[in-house]
């Protein structure tokens, strides 16, 4: 079986005069982009410019929605009700959809950011709120998620799910990410990160902090653009995936290939 994977990164995470990461350089590596929608980062002009550039080069656009937390960059827990999570998700998808429409493209997926992304993996009420918002807005959208509650809630509503493998983050034995507040949560050795990514895609496993080879699905690899050496690392990961015989493809193609393979083996 030929392995295929999508490459995605979080883009448009500046605000006003401030920028974060080198989005233009990173776009050369990607097939998809999670674009900040103004709640943890991003503003109308940044959203407009980022969507326009993605449309120009054929990178799929996704809504990177978050808790309303500009000061904390969406990485702090907030005591929102599930219905607030639902309406905040709808609001942010709608905002990005407007820019996508203006530039002759559309939304392809959604991807919860930061603390919200962590919580929807373990909280059924938040997971159902996000999945319900997506289902009511556009049932063709792919939900990017780790294995967990959001993936389950989205599938229960008949939505397509893309499982995210995070290249530079440490995993616990239960499949959750080591919190950023803990030592070793973010990996920095480029060789180790590239090797882990290739294994994740070709072997379907990730080495945990406990030393286990944890089975994982991986439809898309999340590359971070806001860490030192991020562009060189992203290019190395892409290069080593290609060397390993992995096809880099848009997420819709990756999911279609896996669905066809499942049908063929049934």
Question: What is the role of each PLM region?
Answer:
Residues 10, 64, 110, 223:
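Conserved, mostly hydrophobic/aromatic
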Residues 19, 23, 33-40, 71-86, ...:
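Glycine-rich tight-turn/loop motif centered on a GG-T
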Residues 24-28, 49-62, 101-104:
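Acidic (Asp/Glu)-rich catalytic clusters
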Residues 123-129:
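Charged helix-capping and loop-helix junction motifs
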Residues 148-205:
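Active-site rim beta-loop-alpha module in soluble metabolic enzymes
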Residues 259-260:
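Short, low-complexity intrinsically disordered segments enriched in A/P/G/S/L with frequent Arg
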């Amino acid at each position: 079986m030929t392995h295929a994977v999508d490459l995605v990164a979080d883009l448009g995470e500046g605000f006003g005069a401030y920028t974060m990461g080198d989005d233009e350089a990173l776009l050369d590596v990607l097939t998809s982009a999670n674009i900040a929608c103004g709640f943890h980062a991003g503003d109308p002009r940044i959203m407009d410019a980022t969507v326009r550039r993605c449309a120009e080069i054929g990178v799929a656009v996704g809504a990177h929605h978050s808790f309303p937390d500009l000061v904390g960059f969406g990485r702090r827990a907030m005591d929102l009700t599930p219905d607030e999570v639902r309406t905040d998700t709808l609001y942010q998808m709608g905002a990005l959809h407007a820019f996508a429409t203006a530039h002759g493209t559309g939304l392809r997926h959604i991807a919860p950011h930061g603390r919200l992304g962590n919580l929807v993996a373990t909280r059924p009420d938040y997971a159902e709120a996000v999945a319900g918002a997506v289902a009511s807005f556009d049932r063709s959208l792919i939900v990017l998620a780790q294995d967990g509650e959001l993936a389950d809630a989205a599938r229960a509503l008949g939505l397509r799910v893309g499982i995210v493998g995070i290249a530079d983050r440490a995993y616990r034995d239960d499949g959750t990410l080591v919190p950023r507040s803990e030592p070793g949560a973010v990996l920095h050795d480029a060789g180790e990160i590239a090797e882990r990514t290739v294994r994740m895609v070709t072997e379907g496993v990730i080495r945990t902090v406990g030393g286990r080879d944890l089975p994982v699905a991986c439809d898309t690899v999340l590359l971070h653009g806001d860490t030192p050496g991020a562009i060189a690392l992203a290019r190395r990961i892409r290069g080593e995936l290609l060397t390993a015989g992995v096809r880099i493809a848009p997420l819709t193609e990756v999911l279609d290939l896996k669905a066809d393979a499942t049908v063929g083996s049934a």
